[in-house]
């Protein structure tokens, strides 16, 4: 099981995932036109983050002289070489798709990207006048010579490298102008007076083009020889010595500020940039040639997300209104609904509103005594945090673990943590050495029979915005066995993290890997007795070597294993004698597949766990994660049916072969787009009323 050929490199597997995202833009029949643009933007943003975190980490290993090989047999240097080759190929595919297909198709729909040089002189004059008024005051020209140090360039900044000639002295100079991130990257010409406002014909101009045309205003005594675009990506991973941190909040604030100064890991340049300017940047940014990427066209494509604001419904996905079974029947009493039986929702097909309503109702209910909750990514305008603040202000006991180390959400979470503290909530910033990624809410309510505990347990964040875009399960219960263990977990989080006696919950870093492998081994034993055994797992990533090896053992024993893995998968299915009984698919579609579900047939007494944990070392060892059991057999069957539907997808699913390559699933079975099927079923259910609907939504 230690043979490197049995495994796929983690970093390359992630790049293969992002290639599947890009394919949603490339394939013309998959999405409306503007939605295809969205996938170009998502692909580009994903790749930026990959360099900021993953590539930066491997670069540090190389700098430290580390040559330890990954489980698939690659050294850090070898990984960087393969990453570079794959990224160059993917960027070419992206630009071919954008410039050769999508932009011409948009132009045919009256949405055009224009070049300044192609505009009539009258319109150029209007734009130049607008530049002087709206852009020029924001710009800062920065010289580089013996009297001016090389200018600092922030992470993800788009810049212009300018060659200047002193007219009087004939000396060649260099300067830099940053394209302001506070201004829209795409200038909508229809909104500029004097350039027309025909809504049927929208024109966009990259802001950097307009700046380049007006550089003479910034350097009035010099001749502009040439200007070239370039873009910087820096190491954005925050290193925190938590054992030495006296105040975690202040330490993370300092770390967020330091993110601007991380080492440069990628320099994007235009191919026309002359060698001496290229070398000047390489030398002063202290990078190597392998960090430089030549990119035709505009640099930094995540800004294309701005096009989603265009009001052209025919070029976008048809709006979907999620099903909310409480709309007519809840009567404001979600607690009675939970008391009548466990509730399971599948977002975004089921509305996220009941989750918000649960917290809001708990905050306003005079019989609710306390609310405890974990928060990881909640968004910038969170109704859930506002409800918690309302609860604290009304005198309820409110305890909230706000994970300050949630990457790229640190500043937002710091703001919410302070706001909660200001109204009297008990706020925990996280645990030393661990990120708390679990999704838990515990509400204690006074009722005629005594105090009663209500739970919301989820696979996704407490964020209504992502609740419309990510597929996740929400589970409501008043089960005392689960409530007791969740109470113990909250006490461990707010006190000292030492409790280990969980019988029902799987809690990382305590028992998740151990219990998952035990359940795999149980299927192996059952398969050997009866030639049966079935495992279905759905997750974002499968990386953990010990779990992969357990799955290989299960396959060799005859257990039938189906894995739905959205992103990274280091397991190779279909290898004779090793993994021929394992199938791996990945679904990429309108919604981001985000739920985690682990189903074990258990000889006819199936067990199902849902929760926050992927099968990665970081989730099993370095985070507080939870997987919770679903006891209701009807709900277990419902989730199994969800998984089987996804496994039958032959329109949006990809499969991985024994060689580690991904191909689209294509067969002669009836066509199935699982996400569309879930939406269609909810649309058909919208006239259904009554709590019984919770058992038959799928």
From Swiss-Prot:
GO terms for biological process: polyphosphate biosynthetic process. CDD domains: PLDc_PaPPK1_C1_like, PLDc_PaPPK1_C2_like. ATP binds at residues 46, 470, 566, 594. Mg(2+) binds at residues 377, 407. The active site is at 437 (phosphohistidine intermediate). InterPro entries: PP_kinase, PP_kinase_C_1, PP_kinase_middle, PP_kinase_middle_dom_sf, PPK_C_dom2, PPK_N_dom, PPK_N_dom_sf. Its cofactor is Mg(2+). GO terms for cellular component: polyphosphate kinase complex. Its EC number is 2.7.4.1. Keywords: ATP-binding, Kinase, Magnesium, Metal-binding, Nucleotide-binding, Phosphoprotein, Transferase. It comes from the Bacteria. It catalyses: [phosphate](n) + ATP = [phosphate](n+1) + ADP. An intermediate of this reaction is the autophosphorylated ppk in which a phosphate is covalently linked to a histidine residue through a N-P bond. Gene3D superfamilies: Endonuclease Chain A, Polyphosphate kinase middle domain, Polyphosphate kinase N-terminal domain. One of its GO terms (molecular function) is polyphosphate kinase activity. Catalyzes the reversible transfer of the terminal phosphate of ATP to form a long-chain polyphosphate (polyP). Belongs to the polyphosphate kinase 1 (PPK1) family. PANTHER family: POLYPHOSPHATE KINASE (PTHR30218:SF0). NCBIfam families: poly_P_kin, PRK05443.1-1, PRK05443.1-2, PRK05443.2-2. This is Polyphosphate kinase 1. The gene is ppk1.
